[in-house]
Amino acid sequence: MSAIIEIEHLRKSFGENEVLKDINMNVNKGEVVTIIGSSGSGKSTLLRCINLLEKPTDGKIIYNGKNVLERGYSLPKYRTHLGMVFQSFNLFNNMNVLENCTSGQMTVLKRNKEEAKKIALENLEKVGMARFIDSKPAQLSGGQKQRVAIARALSMDPDVLLFDEPTSALDPEMVGEVLKTMKNLAHTGLTMVIVTHEMEFARDVSDRVI
């Protein structure tokens, strides 16, 4: 298996507080890697560094053989290859479900409306949310919102999908539906990096647990 992402000697500090210290890890294409650890250990910061929502203090992030932190590398282009599912869904409240899943495709990937709609519907079907296309986020449960967020990320055709504790903001009865959705995506060719406290889930789906 070839590495799609290689992290070498990564460090991240906030002022005097060094959150990530000399992190080294590889993620192979199609692999499901789960990162576990105690609260405050820097798991979410690592994901945010991988997609450059946070700029690392030092080290390398190598994507398909090229260091994305080198001057001249196109960060917007790099970010189009990474999807991220956040704890707090981050849906657009003024848009319905379908619009949430098409707006990024049309704006960033320059797809036309019909193509974007077709791809969005395919992914909403995958996560069991196709019948809610006209609903606004306020009309959905937390679990439903997170499944829409997953469909939205998938609709951007990412090479790597990052999950930052996707069930931590959910009521216990809604956790299962999101984990089931993620389990169905695992080992379909999509590369997944997951931060979670769900240990049983991590054991079931992961190729590696870090």
Where are these predicted regions, by residue range?
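ABC family nucleotide-binding domain
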Residues: 3-210
